[in-house]
Amino acid sequence: MTIPNSDFMIENGVCDFPTTPEEEKRIVSELITESEDNLKEGNLYFVISKRWYTSWEKYVEQSTKEYISGESSEASRPGPIDNHDIIESESDVNDPQLRRLLMERVDYVLVPQEVWKRLVEWYSGGPPIERKLICQGFYTRSYSVEVYPLCLMLTDGRDESRTVIRLGKQASIRELYEKVCALTGVPQEKAHIWDYFDKRKNGLLDSLSYKSLEESSLHMDQDILLEVDGSSSSQSAMSSTGNELALVPLEPSRSSVTIAGGPTLSNGHSTTSNFSLFPRITSEDDGSNSLSILGKGEKGGLAGLSNLGNTCFMNSALQCLAHTPPIVEYFLQDYSDDINRDNPLGMCGELAIAFGDLLKKLWSSGRNSVAPRAFKTKLARFAPQFSGYNQHDSQELLAFLLDGLHEDLNKVKRKPYIELKDSDSRPDDEVAEELWNYHKARNDSVIVDVCQGQYKSTLVCPACGKISITFDPFMYLSVPLPSTLTRSMTVTVFYCDGSHLPMPYTVIVPKNGSIRDLITALGTACLLAEDESLLLAEVYDHKIFKYFENPLDSLSSIKDDEHIVAYRLNQMPKGSGKAKLEILHGGQKRPILESVRGRDVKLFGTPFVTYVNTEPLSGADIDAVLSRFLSPLHKVHAPSKIHNGSENGHLPDATVDEASEILSSPDTEIDDASDRELSFRIFLTDERGLNFKPLQSESSISLGIATRVLVEWNEGEHERYDSSYLSDLPEVHKTSFSAKKTRQESISLFSCLEAFLAEEPLGPDDMWFCPSCKEHRQANKKLDLWKLPDILVFHLKRFTYSRYLKNKIDTFVNFPVHDLDLSKYVKNKNDQSYLYELYAVSNHYGGLGGGHYTAYAKLIDDNEWYHFDDSHVSSVNESEIKNSAAYVLFYRRVRSETETQTVEMSTDMD
């Protein structure tokens, strides 16, 4: 597919371009507004790389005055649209496939079709990545763009060949038949397509059905099987894997430790060694109705959960709930009388039934793993935010599931209206009990009984001193990590005077800090002199992507996986102009002048950047600056040759001295530098790297905001200089997939809880209306624990959010496995025990988007811990439970002897 070049289109008058960035911004804004006003299913959207879109946003944000005068450092118009950083490297240009686990507004943006058309007219580029708008949800219909269509692996039963089929999840079974038959050339009346999940025939798909693929429980990357009437191979396959397979019992594990399947990759692909049409009897679809009763000595609760395509987050949360003793006990009994099918806040009992069915299968005998397909389908129906195949947050899924189960099991069929009374200086215990009873009068379920507690909230008006006290229920405690206040960043410093090799520095800066904070920390780390400054820039694809010149800009705009450099410069004298010189490095098989508009030029390494003040600038001046930069990279034993017109050599010392004059002295006139041959082949180029003009010593260059040149490296230069120092820039923050990190900077769960309970002012967007002042005030808020539940869940807030990105904190949190004593944090003193022990953990490994969830859970009766990694289950030592991957902690109350006796007496009376 050939996309026309924007330069060609301008030259030939193919399209009319906006005359200013402001006009361009206005046109796009109007098109976006028009699209939002006319939302309908099937509208087309296009995926654009966030990197390119950010450069475009900065371009159109400048004023017309800045653009015309050239005063803005962001005046450069972006090059062609470039989506190559978000598509698979081996992707077909005519059918580009997005990389897995990308995040919207972090890796890509979505624009309506009309906006895409305009951007392509103005900039060209691509490749185009088209997606459709779909409508989903049960009670509340919402629109969303299906960024990742359903990917199915089609196995042809005739020859066992495999083909990838891509369709939207809302496509019908009928459409699936049409696509498969068109692809294979099989008449539709002879085709039979099976749901072949886990290489087992789970059901024949009806060729005439308009049921969607999602409603049919087909999931990302799963197998489907094509059988053709009259084919001997298909007949053989049918006889060996037909419906009689359902009669084959699952063989119970003969080991005390169930190892189910193998490790599952975080993108939803399971590792398998050999492909076969014959089934592996290792897993069970949760749609099955058969259950086996646990025999004597058999263990339940050791079944894994198959990954259905980035569902490790769901599997982790489900395993933690599936090992919560009171919840397991409740759902393994008959709970049908508690199902509330008429609750408008519930899901007609369907979510509770799906969860209960899944729980029974996880605790039945002979289970190696369970495929939670029916549960996933119900979840997507009632919570469209969890539909599709993007990675999600296990805590967010847990919060929705607990709330949904409560509403489906709420015994209160008709909620009474209760007018809340003012506290009127009454004792706290009286008000708290009254509000808890009000809450219970409208909310009565096993979830409330087991998982909900109560905290005290105190607000103090900063103006009049009015105190407001309320008591509110909670399902879990989301506690901050004190380390979220800071952030470590690694930046590579380049010395423009050639005094040192490029050096990476890692500094600690405020999480919500500014560019000034980073420059100050870097300056301290690299011993920056008073007459020196640092110029920060992001390097992408071996070019300068953007500069960070506004000291007040937020650090949140810098992502952890970006490559940031700082150029150490001598400060320019006051009154002198500042023009940037960017030196790019290139090398390719054909000489640059023989390349076609730069397409054969292969860039490498990190650009050199400095300020220059000689006007006009000559080729010899640039050569001198380049030699200065390269001087510390000179190999000790490299051959040294003076340039003679055909061979390159390093410059004599006089040239290196000239460079410092160009960089620091605005009044220096360089007369003798232009009399020499250049030591490198240097080309003047544009910001897109499409045009090249060879430079000679005497070449005269007018300076703009940024002057870009390209240096052509050949084998001789690589022999003379160690170019490895220009490559392999470290990321701002490299997140390790391993959770076993140093615990030097560990914090305790208690310090997290204390940060959660600490008094703090409300945010400006969360003002409190003071009933005394009759004004919204930024009051001070203080939380205290009042009533704790039997099951206490701590959510460690490892993920922080800003306008530009999400960030993860990998700090190790030291949490007790036994004897978590919360007595001193509970204001309501009574005879209850506030001692807890850990029984489950939801873990998150790696960074955002590309991470993976697992779970630790304890079989309490056996006092043994197990690791649940999707379908893989293994025993684990208790000492391994505590690591920096811990994300959600599940504790159960350890009752005192008095409480235990009271509970036993109550049970006997019932």
Swiss-Prot record:
It catalyses: Thiol-dependent hydrolysis of ester, thioester, amide, peptide and isopeptide bonds formed by the C-terminal Gly of ubiquitin (a 76-residue protein attached to proteins as an intracellular targeting signal). Residues 68-89 are annotated as: Disordered. The keyword Hydrolase applies. The keyword Protease applies. Residues 19-134 form the DUSP domain. GO terms for molecular function: cysteine-type deubiquitinase activity. Its EC number is 3.4.19.12. Keywords: Hydrolase, Protease, Thiol protease, Ubl conjugation pathway. This is Ubiquitin carboxyl-terminal hydrolase 9. The lineage of its organism: Eukaryota, Viridiplantae, Streptophyta, Embryophyta, Tracheophyta. The gene is UBP9.
